[in-house]
């Protein structure tokens, strides 16, 4: 499944991106709040509905108020819910009360985990998917947690896997170098993603060694595939 991103400040630019990927045969769209613009819930919903009308594809919403400075509120969800194309949401607010609200009040919108350190809670509340950057270089651990919880329903084992993954999640989310860690993780997995773009700088040698150690301890199976750059 190919999902095309439509993130842009102006609605016109998001529409252009949406129609372009629709013409390329993409299966769905990822629709965010326009960054920096700080729209009201009504303005934000009108933006999403305009993108929907232009492309007419299934849409995954992406709620990340920490980066976008605006929440996809209940008013917003009520407005966009008038279109059946809005079928899922990647929830990255970190607010567990929003997870409860989505599960209880919007059962027609599939929940996708967008906050790694809450993955277990998301699965317990009915999320069946997890959009996570760390899976690019450590897919074994991420798939194991998803399968254990979502497919097998074994939350006792799921808690053990989650506990083993938490050091990696802390490294990615709390170290202030999320993108750099993802890129280096891909590089040591044999999937070079290039250096981070300015103004971001690459990890230091100590930071690289720290990430390697976290992966090694968390996921020995994954680590056997790593090819450490010289």
Which stretches of residues belong to each language-model region?
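Conserved small/polar residues in nucleotide/adenosyl-binding loops
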Residues: 224-230
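Flexible C-terminal active-site loop/helix
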Residues: 191-223
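Catalytic alpha/beta core domains of metabolic enzymes, predominantly
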Residues: 67-163, 172
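A non-catalytic, amphipathic alpha-helix used as a structural packing/dimerization or gating element
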Residues: 157-168, 206, 210-213
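Active-site beta->alpha loop and helix N-cap motifs at the rims of alpha/beta catalytic domains
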Residues: 1-69
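Conserved, mostly hydrophobic/aromatic
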Residues: 21, 51, 89, 122, ...
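Conserved short secondary-structure transition element at the edge of the structured enzyme core
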Residues: 126, 165-198
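Alpha-helical structural signal in soluble globular domains
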Residues: 20, 24, 50-55, 76-83, ...
């Amino acid at each position: 499944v190919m999902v095309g991103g439509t993130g842009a400040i102006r609605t016109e630019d998001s529409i252009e991106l949406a129609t372009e990927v629709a013409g390329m045969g993409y299966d769905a769209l990822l629709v965010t709040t326009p960054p920096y613009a700080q729209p009201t819930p009504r303005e934000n919903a009108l933006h999403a509905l305009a993108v929907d009308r232009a492309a007419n594809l299934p849409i995954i919403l992406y709620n990340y108020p920490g980066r976008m400075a605006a929440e996809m509120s209940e008013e917003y969800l009520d407005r966009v819910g008038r279109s059946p194309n809005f079928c899922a949401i990647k929830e990255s607010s970190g607010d567990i009360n929003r997870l409860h609200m989505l599960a209880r009040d919007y059962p027609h919108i599939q929940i996708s985990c967008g906050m790694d350190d809450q993955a277990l809670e998301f699965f317990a509340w009915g999320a069946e998917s997890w959009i996570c950057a760390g899976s690019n270089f450590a897919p074994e651990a991420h798939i194991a947690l998803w399968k254990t919880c979502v497919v097998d329903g074994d939350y006792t084992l799921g808690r053990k896997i989650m506990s083993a993954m938490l050091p990696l999640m802390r490294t990615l989310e709390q170290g202030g170098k999320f993108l750099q860690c993802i890129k280096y993780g891909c590089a040591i997995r044999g999937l070079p993603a290039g250096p981070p773009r300015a103004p971001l700088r690459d990890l230091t040698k100590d930071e690289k060694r720290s990430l390697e150690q976290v992966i090694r301890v968390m996921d020995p199976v994954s680590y056997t595939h790593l090819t450490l750059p010289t």
